[in-house]
């Protein structure tokens, strides 16, 4: 009888598998592979090698605390001669001396997560069991049988592997790109993402069922959407919008997801203070990309928050055009969410592809603060019965806005506001380029088209189908020149009279600081004209000067000012309203890289900024981070005030660990100039 087969060790071939599975950055200490794709391992035996005629090898894999074959979280499979599609299989690749090289293949619909791999070896009546090791299984955008399969290599690189990008802020008229370090392959982030799944309420309620359902990107996406906010659970971020961030970090100060996720884990899964929509979206993007789901951050300008699902935002204003009463239904200057790419076997054909997920806690969905995934295609078609949360997302990009003006005598008049259109310039980063891609057409048909009317009819969007009133008068807000932080500038109410009548009107022109979610701050400029003559077929521009001394103490970190013009013709009771959000441009952060950018060789980043304000800056700090360039955030404090017009400059050491293209992201903070962002692309060559 042959002697017992004894395993000496198992080599999980981290380098080879990491390269083949696009997980090299994750495979430095553990095996991380993607489902539906073979991976390799080598068994080293003592004394003799495996003999097919006398030895039997059976492998087992388990995941989760309560594995079962029925749930798909446990499998036993023998060594086979060939791969069986859709099943766990192990086949021999090579055999030499006392080593056996194997190929293991996982099903393309296996649950993702941490697995234990074991071997049962038997020779005759003798048998032994060995734990070969652990591996983490991810979704696989490279596998055609996987629900997250993307057929474009460029898109797979961008939406799964790229660790840096941009998030778009500002306003629809002045779109501002904010650099962000997603860092999904940075040390410890994958483990944190798995912890996030393991503390979600569905896992705590029924761990076996939760682990089984991790085979579905729809399910995982919905869990992540709920876990990025902390409103119902041990989620990552606490949202705050009142500009009081003293006991945490201002949402505008973050420059990456890595620091946020590490803080959450290091403090026992306690919420991190504070987040707003783009921070929630960016952290969700990091987690989903890390787990293998192609994901991108999306910004919608003039985004509606419709609480009662009537697709209508009604503003009740006083005679000066100021919003009165309940402000819960608002138009946000911009709002960010994520889109993830996946099939939807739970829905009708045609709804695969990009799915919208919104982790910002706004409304409950099935009892939890989460939103989506909902097919972007369903939003475009007005199919509001589609899972999940289609009416809310449809309203964000399509809600109608009605303004009512109430006079002192109690009478209410409908105002015409042509300046506020919901769902503009829906934006995401372009594939492979540091540019913005406009994806509005994926959410909406062209305005006025027959397809748009069909979608609105399907959604029962009666307000949008109604004919718009025309008065022969038009008004819009114009700006004279670029608006830089610290400067004085002019804005104009530009009025056009397209009728043969002469009118004498009242004009109120007002500027107020505003948060990105539409909450107004103090006035920073106003003009009231009681008798404005508008001659037939004429145009007139009325200027308003906005002074730095008026807005400096009340501007939020969003750098936004809302200008409102209300034109009233009292004889015919005509009310015309125009609004525009102005974004004040921060100064440029200049970044120089000193030294030859090579792997594992020290580099120096020289970072500088010129104070654009007419006053000194105090409490100045620079913070930098970049996946592959820094192991953690680096912060330098400036001890002395930076006088008006003066340049402040610091140097920081970097140690790039990985070759290729990286982004160094910088944030500048001070007492009067906050959340100034900058970035520099750095290409690291081989050592």
Curated annotation (Swiss-Prot):
Reported induction: By retinoic acid.
Binding site for GTP: 476-483, 580-583
Activity regulation statement: Acyltransferase activity is regulated by the binding of GTP and Ca(2+): inactivated by GTP, which stabilizes its closed structure, thereby obstructing the accessibility of substrates to the active sites. In contrast, Ca(2+) acts as a cofactor by inducing conformational change to the active open form. In absence of Ca(2+), Mg(2+) may bind Ca(2+)-binding sites, promoting GTP-binding and subsequent inhibition of the acyltransferase activity. Extracellularly reduced and activated by CLIC3.
Protein species of origin: Homo sapiens
Pfam families: Transglut_C, Transglut_core, Transglut_N
Similarity-based family: Belongs to the transglutaminase superfamily. Transglutaminase family.
Outcome after substituting residue 278 to L: Abolished isopeptidase and transamidase activities
Enzyme Commission number, as recorded: 2.3.2.13, 3.4.-.-, 3.5.1.44, 2.3.1.-
In-chain residues carrying the UniProt-annotated modification Phosphoserine: 60
Effect of residue 516 to L: No effect on isopeptidase and transamidase activities
Positions carrying N6-acetyllysine: 468
The keyword Acetylation appears for this protein: yes
Complex formation: Monomer. Interacts with phospholipase C; promoting alpha-1 adrenergic receptor signaling. Interacts with PLCD1.
Catalytic activity: L-glutaminyl-[protein] + L-lysyl-[protein] = [protein]-L-lysyl-N(6)-5-L-glutamyl-[protein] + NH4(+); L-glutaminyl-[protein] + serotonin = 5-serotonyl-L-glutamyl-[protein] + NH4(+); L-glutaminyl-[protein] + dopamine = 5-dopaminyl-L-glutamyl-[protein] + NH4(+); L-glutaminyl-[protein] + histamine = 5-histaminyl-L-glutamyl-[protein] + NH4(+)
Job of this protein: Calcium-dependent acyltransferase that catalyzes the formation of covalent bonds between peptide-bound glutamine and various primary amines, such as gamma-amino group of peptide-bound lysine, or mono- and polyamines, thereby producing cross-linked or aminated proteins, respectively. Involved in many biological processes, such as bone development, angiogenesis, wound healing, cellular differentiation, chromatin modification and apoptosis.
Substitution effect: residue 278 to F: In TG2-T; strongly reduced isopeptidase activity without affecting the transamidase activity
Protein name, entry field: Protein-glutamine gamma-glutamyltransferase 2
């Amino acid at each position: 009888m042959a002697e017992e087969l004894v395993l000496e060790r198992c080599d999980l071939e981290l380098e080879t598998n990491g390269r083949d599975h696009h997980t090299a950055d994750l495979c430095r200490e553990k095996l991380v592979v993607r489902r539906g794709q073979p991976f390799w391992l080598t068994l080293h035996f003592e004394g003799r090698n495996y003999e097919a005629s006398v030895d039997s090898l059976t492998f087992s894999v388990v995941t989760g605390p309560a594995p079962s074959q029925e749930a798909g979280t446990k499998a036993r499979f023998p060594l086979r001669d060939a791969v069986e599609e859709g099943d766990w299989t192990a086949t021999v690749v090579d055999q030499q001396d006392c080593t056996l090289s194997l190929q293991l293949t996982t099903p393309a619909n296996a649950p993702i997560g941490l697995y234990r791999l074991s071997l049962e070896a038997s020779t005759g009546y003798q048998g032994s069991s060995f734990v070969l090791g652990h591996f983490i299984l991810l979704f696989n955008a490279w596998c055609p049988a996987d629900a997250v399969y993307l057929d474009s290599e460029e898109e797979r690189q961008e939406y799964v592997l790229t660790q840096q990008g941009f998030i778009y802020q500002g306003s629809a008229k002045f779109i501002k790109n904010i650099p962000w370090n997603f860092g999904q392959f940075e040390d410890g982030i994958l483990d944190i993402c798995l912890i996030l799944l393991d503390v979600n309420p569905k896992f705590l309620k029924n761990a076996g069922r939760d682990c089984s359902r991790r085979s579905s990107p729809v399910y995982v996406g919905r869990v992540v959407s709920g876990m990025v906010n902390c409103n119902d659970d041990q989620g990552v971020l606490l949202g705050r919008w009142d500009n009081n961030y003293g006991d945490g970090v201002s949402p505008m100060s973050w420059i990456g997801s890595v620091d946020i996720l590490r803080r959450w884990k290091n403090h026992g899964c306690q919420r991190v203070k504070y987040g707003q929509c783009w921070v929630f979206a960016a952290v969700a993007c990091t987690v989903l990309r890390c787990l293998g789901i192609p994901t991108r951050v999306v910004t919608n300008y003039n985004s509606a928050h419709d609480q009662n699902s009537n697709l209508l935002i009604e503003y009740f204003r006083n005679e000066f055009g100021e919003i009165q009463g309940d402000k819960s239904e608002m138009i946000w200057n911009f709002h960010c969410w994520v889109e993830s790419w996946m099939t939807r076997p739970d829905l009708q054909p045609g709804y695969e592809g990009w799915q919208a997920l919104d982790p910002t806690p706004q409304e409950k969905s099935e009892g939890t603060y989460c939103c989506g995934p909902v097919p972007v295609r369903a939003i475009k078609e007005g199919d509001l019965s589609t899972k999940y949360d289609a009416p809310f997302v449809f309203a964000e990009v399509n809600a109608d806005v009605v303004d009512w003006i109430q006079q002192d005598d109690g009478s209410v008049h409908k105002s015409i506001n042509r300046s506020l259109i919901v769902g503009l310039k829906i934006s995401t980063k372009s594939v492979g380029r540091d540019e913005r891609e406009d994806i509005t057409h994926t959410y909406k048909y062209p305005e006025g088209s027959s397809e748009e009317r069909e979608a609105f009819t399907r959604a029962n969007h009666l307000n949008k189908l109604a004919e718009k009133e025309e008065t022969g008068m038009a008004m819009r807000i114009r700006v004279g020149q670029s608006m830089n932080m610290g400067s004085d500038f002019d804005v104009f109410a530009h009025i056009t009279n397209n009728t043969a009548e002469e009118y004498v009107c009242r004009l109120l022109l007002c500027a107020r600081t505003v948060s990105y979610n539409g909450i107004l701050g103090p006035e920073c400029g106003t003009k009231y004209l009681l008798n404005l003559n508008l001659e037939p077929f004429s145009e007139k521009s009325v200027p308003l000067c906005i002074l730095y001394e008026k807005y400096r103490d009340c501007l939020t970190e969003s750098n936004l000012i809302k200008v409102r013009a209300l034109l009233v013709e009292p004889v015919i009771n005509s009310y015309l309203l125009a609004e525009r959000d102005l974004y004040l441009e921060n100064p440029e952060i200049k970044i120089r890289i000193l030294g030859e950018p090579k792997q594992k060789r020290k580099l120096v980043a020289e970072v500088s900024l010129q104070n654009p304000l007419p006053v000194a800056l105090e409490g100045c700090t620079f913070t930098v981070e970049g996946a592959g360039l820094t192991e953690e955030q680096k912060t330098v404090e400036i001890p002395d005030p930076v006088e008006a017009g003066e340049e402040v400059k610091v140097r920081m050491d970097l140690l790039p660990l990985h070759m290729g293209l990286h982004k160094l992201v910088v944030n500048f903070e001070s007492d009067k100039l906050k959340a100034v962002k900058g970035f520099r692309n750095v290409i690291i060559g081989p050592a």
